[in-house]
Every structure is written in C-alpha cells, then in structure tokens.
C-alpha cells in the first residue's frame, strides 16, 4: 500500500483491489443500511485488536529525506488512518516501533506476506460494504463541499453587493457635499459681482455729478449741443426700443422656461410612475419566482406520484400475468377435464351400444346369467367410482373458477384504484396546466407592461433630447442677449466719452448760451432721470439674467439627475430583461417537464387502456369459462341422466333376466312334466304295443298332446318377442 512510506501504519492483509474484485456476486447484492455498516466496521476493529502481531515498520532513512517528504508522509498517514475503519482486517500487522536497520524491515515484510498468504480468505460481502461506504463517504463529502462552496459564493456576492451599496452611498454623500460647496462658491461670486456692479453704479453717479458740474460750467455750450441732445434722444429712444424688445424677449423666455419646467415636472411624474411600475414588476417577478418554486415542488411530487403509479402498474401487470398463467393452467385443466368428459361420453355411448347389444343378446345372456351379473355389478361399481371422481374434479374446477373470479374481482378493484389515482393525477395536471396558462397570461401582461414602459422610456428619452435641445437654444439665446447687453453698455460708455469730449470742446461756447442754461438744465435733469431709470432697468435686467442663469443651472442639474435616473431605469430594464430571459428559460424547462409529464400521462393512458383491454379480455375469458362451466355442468347433468338411464336399463335388464330365469324354471318344470309324461307315454306305448287292439286310441291321444305342446311353445315365443320390443 501507498501509506507504508512514512511512519508506523497498519498493513492490511489483502490488497484493496482484491477486496473490491474478489467476488462478482457481491456486486449484485443490495446496499446495507448505515447501522449495519457501522457494526461491521466495529467488529472488524475488534478482530484486528485480537489478532494483531507486532511488526517493525520501515526505517527512516535520512534526516534530509524525512524533511523533504514530511508533508507527503503526513498526508499518507491521514489517508491511511481515515481508511482503516472501512477496511476488512482479518490478519493485520501493526508496526509499533521504528527500527534502525533496513534488513529487519524487509524480513518483517516477508513474514507479513507469509502471514497474509496463510490467512483466511476475505469476505466479499464485507469488502463490497467497505467499498460502498468509502464511495458514499466520498460522494457525501464532495456534495457537502459543493454546498459549502455555493453558500460561500452566495455570501461573498451578498457582501460584495452590500459593500457596493455602501460605496455608492458614500459617493452620493460626497457628491452632495461638493454640490453644496459649489453652490456656496457661486453665491459668493454672484455677491462679488453685485458689489462690483454697485461700485460701477457709484462711479457712474460720480461721473454724472461731475457731468452736472461741467454742465453748470458749460451752459454756454448747450446751444451747440442741442443737435447732439436730439441725436442722443434718438439714440435713447432706440435704446428704449431695444430694451422693450429685450423685455419682450425676456417674457417669451420666461414663458418658455415655465413650459420647460412644466415638462420637467411631467417627466418627473412619469419617472416616478415608471419607478413604481418597475417596483410592481419586480414584486411580480418575485411572485413568479415563488410560484415557479412551488410549481417545481409540485412537479417533484407529481414525479414521485408517477413513479409510485408506474410501480403499482408494474405490480398490477405482474399480477395480471400471474392471473393469465393461472387462467392458462385452468384452461389446460379444463381441457383435460373436457377430454375426460369426452372419454366418459364415449364410454357412455359404448355402454349404450353394449346395452343395445345386451338387449339384442338377451337370449344368449340368459345362458350366461351368473357371469353377466358379476360383470354388470363390477361395471356399475366402476361407473359409480368414476362418477364420484368426476364430481370431485368438477367441484375442484368450480373452486378454481371461484378463485379465478375472486382474483379477477381483486384485479378489477386494483384497476379501479389505479384509475382513481390516474384521474386524480390527471386532475392535478389539469390544475397545473391551468396555473401554467395563468402564468403565461401573467407573463404576457408583464411583457406588455415592459413594452409599455420601454415605449415610455423611449418617449422620455425623446422628451429629454428635446429639452436638452431647448436648453441649448436657451443658453445660446441668453448668450446672445448677454452679448447685446454688453454691446449696448459699450455703446453707452462710448457715447458718454464722446459727450465728455464734446462738452470739453463746447466749454468755450457755453458762455454764449448761459441764457438757455435753465432750459438745458431742465432737459438734462429729465435725461438724468431717464438715465437713472435706464440704470435701474439695467440692474433689474441683470438680476433677471442672474435668476435666469440660476434657473438654467437648476434645469441642467435636473436634467443631469434625469439622465442618471434614465440610466438607472435603463439598467433596471436590462436587469428585468435578463430576469425575463431567465424566467423564459425556466418556463421552457417547465414546459419541457410538462410535455414529458403529458407524454408520461399519455403512456399511462395507453397502459391503462391496454390494461382495460386486458381486463375486458380477462372478463370475456371469465365469461367464456363460466359458459364452459355451465356447459360442463349441463354435460355432467346429461351424463348423470345418462348414467341414471343406464342404471335403470341395467335394472330393467336385471329384472328381465330374473323374469327369464323364472320363466326358465317354469319351462324346466314343464319339461320335467313333459319328460314324465313322455316316460308315462312310453310306458303306455309299450303297454299298447303289448295290447294291439288299443293302438288307435293311443295314437289319437298322442296327436292331441302334440298339438297342445305346439300351442304352448308358440305362446312362449310370442311372450319373448313382446319383452324384447319393450
């Protein structure tokens, strides 16, 4: 053995392959129970403890080799110790000590081989039990390891999913914090921009004050600048028109933004509805999985019921075969009985012929009456014995027929039970088919809902694309408006610079126009009011633009969130599609199983139809047997009647023989009388001869007596003919 390499271990008496291949008959024996296996192992261990002689094990060679092969030796030792309880130990040797010489180990091995050769032959049944135990232990270990691996894999997947969920939650928290920080940063930047705008407004106010001072100083130059003021008025009117257009554009943009916001809200509602529908579909899928598990359990139960019914059918077939054999036997017995009855009939016919011959030969039988009487008595006794035997055989046949009928009734009961079981299984299969149809309808409904959800998702994607396009258009329009506002601002600053230059140029000319200063002041005050109003309008426009930017950013964020939700929905839809594919595959397997079950049911139907046909044949055969029984009974009755008639005929013949005997005695008496008369007649003739005179008288008397004798003989012959005719 391989585990003799390292350390002290047990040396088995017979190799393991010889134990498993010792007897072919042991392989065909049935597997024992686990308790018997444990008892046998314990008995083998006890025998091993009784018989073990000590042997020296193989010597440890070198320290280096031991260090190299230590792991292998430990493994072999563990394998040997685990296999020892399952081995048959008739004459084992225990190596307890480690020698220092290789020669002693070789000698011990040779002695062990000799002991093994002298030992008793192993029990093949126990060897087979050991092999089966080892095989079952290996199979159970492998199955347990596979189950543990599956459970570990499932637990690892669950833990990985939990870790992924935790990582996603952390990422979401970090994104929220980053988003809040970005919002705060943007708010601070907007505050800074507002402060800058306020500073610019203050600078503009200071510039306007300086311009007022310059106007007060340059009142003379207003006359020349009227034209310029008119031009400025025209420009202001154009700016106001542009501002009014910008306001109208702003209102249109606000209406568009409101419409987009309404669309976004509708999309959010649709997304919520889709999420609810997806949750419902997930719940339905879970329900489908649960129902599928139930159906699988029910299919297993049906398979077990089907196996039981197949076993019952096989037993019923065996019983039917036995009943057929018994019926064949009964048929053979009935054929033998029929042949015996035919022989009896032939004998009866022969007896009738003999009777007729006896009746025809009554004249000859009258001479051999004593011999005929003896033969008739012996034949009557033999006929009585034959009739009694035949009656006993008929009673046995009746008993066999009753037993066969009882067996047929039992088989009918069994077939009725089998038909009931078959109907129950058929009902269960009908119920399962209805459930499968319902599941198919539910699957079609889920498919329709999934298609509707896909259509809605596609519609949402189109709406999102449209909203994205509109947002891009709005951003472009806002950029255009912002650029126009910048251009208007630059034009306004340019005009202010030009006015400053013109005011400096016209400072020399304002001295002449001081008279018109007040009018110009009034006009300038109106212009300043208009400028203030325009600045206020510009500030309001800036605020509105800031709000528009905020709304655009919020809409962008909402669009990003919608994109994420759409991606998650797409992922969920893909997962649902995968689940549906898995469910379709499971459904296909279930449909195949159902088709197999239907095929098995069809086979069962065929078998039941065959059994019913066989039962009908058995019933017809039983009815035929009953008819034959009735025919036999009738034939037996007829035979009995014929035997009775034969007995009566024999009795009549006996009576006739007795009457003939009596008539014979009478005739003998008459003959004696006639002989006496003849003697007397002879004496008288002699006397008459002596007396010749009286001859005539004697002759006349003789003639009279002869006539009388002839008359009596004719009467006797007539009586015999009448008796024979009767």
Curated annotation (Swiss-Prot):
Q: Does the keyword Mitochondrion apply?
A: no
Positions of region (Disordered): 678-726
Coiled coil start-end: 144-691
Polar residues compositional bias, start-end: 691-701
Q: Transit peptide span, please give it.
A: 1-41, 42-95
Gene from which this protein is expressed: MFP1
In which domain of life is the source organism classified? Eukaryota
What's written under domain?
The C-terminal part is necessary for DNA-binding.
Q: Where is the composition biased (Basic residues)?
A: 715-726
What phenotype is described for loss of this gene?
A: Larger chloroplast starch granules than wild-type. However, in most chloroplasts only one large starch granule is present, in contrast to many in wild-type. No accumulation of ADP-glucose, the substrate for starch synthesis. No effect in amylopectin and amylose biosynthesis. Mislocalized PTST2 within chloroplasts. Loss of DNA-binding activity in leaf chloroplasts. Loss of both chloroplastic and nuclear localization in leaves.
Q: What is this protein called?
A: MAR-binding filament-like protein 1
Function noted in UniProt:
DNA-binding protein required for the initiation of starch granules biosynthesis in leaf chloroplasts. Anchored to the thylakoid membranes with its C-terminus facing into the stroma where it is essential for localizing PTST2 and SS4 to the stromal spaces between the thylakoid membranes in order to begin starch granule formation. Associated with leaf chloroplastic nucleoids in vivo. Binds to various chloroplastic double-stranded DNA fragments without particular sequence specificity in vitro.
Signal peptide range equals: none
Q: What is an example of a GO molecular function annotated in this UniProt entry? A: DNA binding
Subunit info here reads: Interacts with PTST2; the interaction is essential for the initiation of starch granules biosynthesis in leaf chloroplasts, for the correct location of the process in the stromal spaces between the thylakoid membranes, and for the association of PTST2 with the thylakoid membranes.
GO cellular component assignments: chloroplast; chloroplast nucleoid; chloroplast thylakoid; chloroplast thylakoid membrane; cytosol; nuclear matrix; plastid nucleoid
Residues in the Lumenal, thylakoid compartment per record: 96-124
Describe PTMs of this protein: Predicted to be translocated into the thylakoid by the Tat system. The position of the transit peptide cleavages have not been experimentally proven.
Q: Keywords in alphabetical order, please.
A: Chloroplast, Coiled coil, DNA-binding, Membrane, Nucleus, Plastid, Starch biosynthesis, Thylakoid, Transit peptide, Transmembrane, Transmembrane helix
Organism source for this protein?
Arabidopsis thaliana (Mouse-ear cress)
Instruction: Quote the SUPFAM superfamilies the UniProt record gives.
Output: Tropomyosin
Tell me which parts of the chain lie in the Stromal compartment: 146-726
């Amino acid at each position: 053995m391989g585990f003799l390499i390292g350390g002290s271990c047990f040396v088995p008496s017979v190799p393991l392959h010889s134990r498993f291949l010792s007897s072919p008959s042991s392989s065909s024996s049935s597997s024992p129970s686990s308790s018997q296996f444990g008892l046998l192992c314990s008995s083998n261990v006890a025998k091993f403890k009784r018989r073990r002689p000590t042997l020296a094990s193989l010597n440890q060679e070198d320290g280096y080799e031991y260090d190299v092969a230590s792991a292998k030796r430990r493994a072999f030792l563990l394998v040997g110790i685990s296999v020892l309880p399952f081995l048959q130990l008739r004459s084992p040797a225990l190596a307890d000590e480690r020698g220092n010489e290789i020669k002693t180990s070789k000698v011990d091995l040779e002695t062990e081989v000799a002991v093994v050769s002298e030992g008793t032959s192993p029990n093949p049944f126990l060897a087979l039990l050991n092999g089966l135990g080892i095989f079952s232990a290996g199979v159970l270990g492998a199955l347990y390891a596979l189950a543990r691996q599956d459970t570990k894999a499932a637990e690892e997947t669950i833990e990985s999913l939990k870790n992924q969920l935790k990582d996603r939650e952390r990422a979401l928290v970090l994104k929220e914090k980053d988003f809040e920080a970005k919002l705060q940063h943007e708010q601070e930047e907007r505050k800074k921009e507002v402060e800058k705008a306020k500073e610019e407004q203050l600078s503009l106010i200071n510039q306007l004050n300086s311009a007022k001072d310059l106007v007060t100083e340059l009142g003379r130059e207003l006359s020349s600048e009227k034209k310029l003021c008119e031009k400025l008025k025209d420009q202001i009117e154009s700016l106001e028109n542009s501002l009014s257009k910008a306001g109208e554009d702003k209102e249109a943009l606000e209406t568009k933004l409101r419409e987009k916001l309404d669309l976004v809200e509708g999309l959010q509602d649709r997304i919520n509805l889709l999420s609810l529908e997806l949750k419902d579909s997930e719940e339905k899928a879970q329900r489908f999985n649960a129902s599928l598990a139930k159906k699988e359990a029910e299919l297993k139960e049906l398979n077990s019921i089907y196996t039981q019914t197949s076993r019952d059918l096989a037993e019923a077939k065996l019983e039917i075969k036995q009943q057929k054999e018994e019926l064949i036997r009964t048929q053979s017995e009935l054929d033998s009985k029929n042949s015996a009855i035919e022989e009896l009939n032939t004998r009866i016919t022969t007896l009738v012929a003999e009777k007729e011959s006896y009746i025809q030969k009554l004249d000859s039988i009258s001479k051999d009456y004593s011999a005929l009487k003896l033969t008739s008595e012996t034949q009557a006794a033999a006929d009585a014995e034959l009739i009694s035997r035949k009656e006993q055989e008929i009673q046995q046949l009746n008993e066999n027929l009753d037993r066969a009928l009882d067996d047929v009734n039992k088989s009918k009961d069994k077939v009725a039970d089998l038909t009931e079981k078959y109907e129950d299984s058929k009902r269960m299969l009908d119920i399962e088919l209805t459930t499968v149809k319902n599941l198919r309808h539910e699957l079609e409904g889920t498919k329709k809902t999934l298609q509707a959800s896909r259509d809605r998702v596609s519609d949402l994607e189109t709406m999102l694309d449209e909203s994205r396009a509109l947002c891009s258009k709005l951003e472009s329009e806002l950029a255009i408006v912002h650029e126009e506002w910048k251009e208007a601002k630059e034009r306004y600053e340019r005009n202010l610079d030009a006015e400053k230059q013109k005011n400096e140029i016209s400072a020399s000319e304002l001295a002449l126009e001081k008279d018109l200063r007040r009018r110009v002041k009034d006009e300038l005050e109106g212009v300043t009011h208009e400028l203030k109003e325009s600045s206020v309008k510009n500030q309001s426009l800036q605020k509105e633009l800031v709000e528009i930017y905020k709304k655009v950013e919020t809409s962008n964020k909402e669009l990003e969130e919608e994109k994420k939700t759409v991606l998650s929905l797409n992922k969920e839809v893909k997962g649902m599609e995968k689940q549906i594919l898995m469910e379709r595959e499971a459904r296909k397997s279930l449909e195949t199983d159902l088709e197999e079950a239907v095929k098995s049911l069809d086979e069962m139907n065929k078998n039941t139809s065959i059994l019913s046909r066989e039962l009908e044949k058995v019933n017809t055969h039983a009815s035929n047997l009953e008819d034959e029984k009735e025919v036999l009974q009738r034939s037996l009755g007829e035979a009995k009647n014929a035997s009775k008639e034969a007995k009566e005929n024999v009795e009549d013949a006996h009576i006739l023989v007795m009457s003939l005997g009596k008539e014979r005695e009478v005739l003998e008496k008459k003959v004696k009388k006639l002989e006496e008369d003849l003697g007397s007649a002879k004496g008288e003739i002699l006397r008459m001869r002596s007396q010749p005179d009286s001859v005539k008288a004697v002759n006349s008397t003789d003639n009279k007596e002869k006539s009388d004798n002839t008359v009596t003989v004719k009467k006797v012959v007539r009586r015999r003919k009448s008796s024979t005719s009767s």
